[in-house]
Regions:
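Acidic, metal-coordinating catalytic segment for phosphate/diphosphate chemistry
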Residues: 1-18
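Short connector loops at helix/strand junctions that flank enzyme active sites
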Residues: 14-16, 22, 33-35, 40, ...
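Conserved hydrophobic "DFG−1" position in protein kinase catalytic cores
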Residues: 19-21, 29, 98, 116
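Conserved Nudix-box catalytic region and its N-terminal flanking loop in Nudix hydrolases
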Residues: 22-61
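Short helix-loop capping/hinge motifs at secondary-structure junctions, enriched
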Residues: 27-28, 101-107
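A short coil-to-beta-strand element that immediately follows conserved catalytic motifs
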Residues: 66-75
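NUDIX/MutT-family hydrolases
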Residues: 95-97, 105-140
Length: 143
């Protein structure tokens, strides 16, 4: 699995948005109803949707975030087969960072619950990808 980071890429290449988020100084992770692991909020871009709108929609749906500040960090790509890429071809996404100050009590997605962690949880859904996203956001001064 290879993860690469870019200052920018052609917008048409961006297929998903992933949002590193903190609330109360802690990392925000989601637990999917069908998995025993934790993941960073995010998801696929809908046809005709701006990638920034994808990020806002996914953050709200998966975490119940109501009050937040969100900003783009960088574009990135993942090459290699994983749960959402059965071809292994390079796929591009946009990484965002959000500070959440208020949550809705009800989730509107496939997520079972939202958890706050001081450190990254050990049981990650994408252990070869998620730590690299956090590291890159830190390198760029976001965390």
């Amino acid at each position: 699995m290879e993860v690469r980071f870019y200052d920018s890429v052609d917008d048409a290449l961006l297929k998903f948005a992933v949002i590193l988020a903190k609330a109360e100084g802690k990392w925000v992770f989601c637990k999917h109803k069908e998995r025993d692991t934790y993941e960073i909020p995010g998801g696929h871009r809908e046809p005709g949707e701006a990638i920034a709108d994808t990020a806002v929609r996914e953050l709200q749906e998966e975490t119940g975030a109501q009050d937040f500040a969100i900003k783009p960090v960088c574009a990135y790509s993942v090459t290699g087969k994983n749960r959402v890429n059965d071809t292994g071809k390079e796929m591009y996404g946009m990484l965002y960072y959000a500070e959440i100050s208020g949550f809705d009590q009800k989730l509107h997605s496939e997520m079972e619950k939202v958890c706050l962690f001081d450190e990254l949880p050990e049981a990650l859904t994408y252990p070869e990808i998620q730590p690299k996203l956090v590291q890159e956001a830190g390198r760029r001064g976001y965390v």
